[in-house]
Each structure stands twice: as structure tokens, then as C-alpha cells.
A protein has these predicted regions:
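C-terminal His-loop and adjacent cap/lid subdomain of alpha/beta-hydrolase
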Residues: 1-336
Length: 336
């Protein structure tokens, strides 16, 4: 058991970056009430299933219930009177923010400003170096094992092809029948952000590197997808990549940027897509706002997110040029 599997083993977390209560480090959100929901369920707080392991051990996946219980408690403790709120997360937590964004919005009156921020969670369904879809295989296992259907936005599920049913059935019954007829493939598609964001109605900010270090290491070039140590040095530090390897990374970037077109076209959404070799930028001071923070349009991430959330600029959508064009990308940024 690890800290990800039990709250008994969780270690203390330092509140830095977007979580900081220091004005200098977090000028726009330093005086907000901040709650961190520690990641522990393995499916971005989406699962709701129980089953049996091969040895007869009972397995319970309750991420969705954990999410609902935490939000219920926060509402009871005063969040119900909030005038502004931001649901955010990084990596798997970023995917959770997307999955639950509209649900979070629905908890509040319409005159409350609710927005979402997704940091380093724009996972793409791309083939790895061997031609396999390693990330798809992993996510498919999660979708199947944890029964994530109830957490997926109904708008996304509604866009998938249902089993043909009689047209005279009422819409509510039709939708129930439709849900029951969805294939695992349909559920899998709605777990990937490229499909997921199409049905999110709440204003959302996508913060991501288009050379995301976690995806390059675990989805594009996972161990076993290449011979020997051919990619080890490149995966450790993008500055070590050969021109041939960079061509492959540029291809990864091209697909990620193309899938962000949906977000780019959405009114009230924001983008900060840098070309730094990093993963998770908002929770760390060095990335969020510091002397060596990545900058796009001469804005740090903190400034761009603040401009977007508080409407200081009409549009906040930055997409970087290809690596290594951005001189503000530092080798000291966090990777995973």
C-alpha cells in the first residue's frame, strides 16, 4: 500500500504556487479558502464499483463517492455561500477537474462565478514508439475495472452511437436505455480530454505543455516500446534528444495542439500551452510565478490564469511555438 492507496499513509503537502497564501507567490488567489483533495482512487475520482480479485479479495472503487462526499462536506462548512470558486487539479487531478467541472458548477447558484482549471491533464490517445496504444490500454483497464460511467458527462455520452430503439420512447427512458447499451469504446473515448471537453459548458482553462514530460515518458516512449536504451537519455532531458527523436516529439505536439482546437474555439475558455519539457506547473512556485517561470505573450502562468478568471483581458489563449523556440523554458521546471 502507498500514499495513493490509503489516507493513513498520506504525507504532508506544501501549499505553493496556486495554493500559496503568500501574495507575492500567488497574487490573485492568495486570500482564497483552499482545499486539496488528496488523490487516492486511481481513476480521477470517477470510479464506483466493487468486485473480486482472483484470490477472492473484495475490491472496492469509490472515487466518485469520495468526490461527492467531500463536496457535500465543504458545502456544509460554508462553501455554499461562496461568490467565486475555481476547481483545479494537475495530472490525474486535472482530468478529475474536467470530469467533474459541470457537476461542480451545478452545486452553486447561477450568479456565482464558477470556473475550472486543468493542468497537465490533456492526455492524448497516441501510439507509442512500437505502434501500440499504451495509454489507451491503461485507461481502458481503468474504465472497465472501476465503472466510471456515472462520472462521465452525459453530453459526451449522448454523442456516442446508441443501440437503435423505437422512436416513440420518451427521452428519459431513451437515455437510460442508451446508457446501458454503450460500448466500452464509447466510455473510453469520453475519458480522454479531446472528447470530454466538447461537452463541458463551464468556462475552463487548459494549462499544458505540448511536450508533456509524463506523456512522453509513459505514453509515447514507455519502457519496452524501443530497443535497449535508445530513448533513455532523451526521455530524461529533452535537450539530449536527437533530430530524429525531436521529429517524433514534434509530431506528438502537433496532435495535442490539433485536439485543443475545440477549447481554442470556445468562448470564455483559456489556454496556456507552452513548449517546455515539464509536467504540472500550477502547484509549483518556480513554474507558476518566479524569475524563471515560462512566459507566453510576456505573461507568467499566474498572470494568464488571473487575467482569464477575472476577465482582465477579453481573450487569454496562448499556444507556444515548437521547442526550442521559447527562451523562458528552464531545465529546472518540474517533470514527472
Amino acid at each position: 500500500m502507498t500514499e495513493f492507496g490509503s489516507s493513513k499513509l498520506m504525507e504532508a503537502v506544501e501549499f505553493t504556487g496556486i495554493l500559496s497564501n503568500r501574495h507575492q507567490e500567488n497574487p490573485d488567489f492568495h486570500n482564497w479558502n483552499i482545499v486539496v483533495i488528496r488523490y487516492c482512487d486511481g481513476a480521477s475520482f470517477a470510479g464506483d464499483a466493487e468486485g473480486e480479485d482472483q484470490d477472492g479479495t473484495k475490491l472496492f472503487f469509490r472515487g466518485l463517492r469520495i468526490w461527492e462526499a467531500v463536496v457535500d462536506e465543504l458545502m456544509a462548512k460554508g462553501m455554499d455561500t461562496a461568490k467565486q470558486a475555481l476547481l483545479t487539479g494537475c495530472s490525474a487531478g486535472s482530468l478529475a477537474a474536467l470530469l467533474h467541472c459541470d457537476n461542480f458548477r451545478e452545486r452553486f447558484p447561477q450568479d456565482v462565478s464558477i470556473k475550472c482549471l486543468s493542468d497537465a491533464g490533456f492526455f492524448i490517445d497516441e501510439k507509442d514508439l512500437s505502434g501500440e496504444r499504451s495509454l489507451r490500454t491503461l485507461i481502458n483497464a481503468i474504465v472497465h475495472l472501476q465503472n466510471v460511467r456515472e462520472a462521465l458527462p452525459k453530453g459526451c455520452l449522448a454523442n456516442k452511437d446508441p443501440t437503435e430503439v423505437s422512436s416513440h420512447i420518451s427521452n428519459s427512458v431513451l437515455f437510460v436505455m442508451f446508457l446501458n447499451s454503450l460500448t466500452d469504446e464509447s466510455l473510453l473515448q469520453c475519458f480522454f480530454p479531446a472528447e470530454l471537453i466538447k461537452s463541458i459548458n463551464t468556462p475552463t482553462f487548459i494549462l499544458n505543455s505540448d511536450y508533456d514530460s509524463w506523456q512522453i515518458r509513459n505514453a509515447l516512449a514507455p519502457n519496452g516500446s524501443y530497443p535497449g536504451q535508445a530513448w533513455s537519455s532523451c526521455k530524461a532531458d529533452i535537450r539530449n534528444c536527437s533530430s530524429t527523436q525531436m521529429d517524433i516529439l514534434h509530431g506528438f505536439r502537433k496532435k495535442l495542439v490539433s485536439e485543443l482546437k475545440v477549447a481554442e474555439d470556445k468562448r470564455d475558455w483559456g489556454l496556456f500551452i507552452d513548449s517546455c519539457f515539464t509536467h504540472c506547473q500550477s502547484p509549483f512556485r518556480i513554474s507558476w510565478i518566479s524569475r524563471i517561470s515560462p512566459r507566453l505573450g510576456n505573461k507568467t502562468i499566474a498572470e494568464a490564469v488571473g487575467d482569464w478568471y477575472f476577465g482582465r483581458r477579453e481573450e487569454v489563449k496562448y499556444i507556444d511555438c515548437k521547442y526550442p523556440c521559447n527562451p523562458t523554458c528552464s531545465s529546472h521546471l518540474p517533470t514527472a
